[in-house]
Amino acid sequence: MVRPYTRKDYIRKIPASKIVQYDMGNLSGEFPLEVTLAVKEHTHLSHNSLEAARIAANRYLQRTTGKLGYRLKIRTYPHHIVRENPMATGAGADRVQSGMRGAFGKAVSSEALVRANQKIITAYVQVKDFEKAKVALNRAAMKLPVTCKLVIDKGHDLVQF
């Protein structure tokens, strides 16, 4: 795993994170069941993929359980700043660019560095909506560039998994 590049004091222009919300649904409700999406291996998750996973899970849960029937929480934050040294291609590119001289690059994106078995997204639902939460988190897992697993954090005695 790489060392995170997070010192924002040294970076002039930081790209904004596309993740709009970290807590969605009924924030004040009590839910007996917590189903969590966890990654199986070390990886980098871009803010774009985290936002796509959030949208997929939130939209499905909102459609199937209603606006007050769930709570969804994003549990990682993209702190790591990704830099890129843009290389010119085509005719005459060697005159325009300086190659690897001054190759530190510009900040282009942000990523979350996640470890194996780290929890990414948690859905809080009623027992009757357990299958819907599983489908929603599986849809979110399809948007991530890593294999994921479902973990029941709370209420595992209430459902068969």
From Swiss-Prot:
Pfam family, one: Ribosomal_L16
GO BP: any one term: translation
Family in the record: Belongs to the universal ribosomal protein uL16 family.
InterPro entries (alphabetical): Ribosomal_uL16, Ribosomal_uL16_arc, Ribosomal_uL16_CS_euk_arc, Ribosomal_uL16_dom, Ribosomal_uL16_euk_arch, Ribosomal_uL16_sf
NCBIfam families: PRK04199.1-4, uL16_euk_arch
Full protein name: Large ribosomal subunit protein uL16
Alphabetic keyword roster: Ribonucleoprotein, Ribosomal protein
One of the record's GO cellular component terms: ribosome
Protein source organism: Methanosphaera stadtmanae (strain ATCC 43021 / DSM 3091 / JCM 11832 / MCB-3)
GO MF annotation terms: structural constituent of ribosome
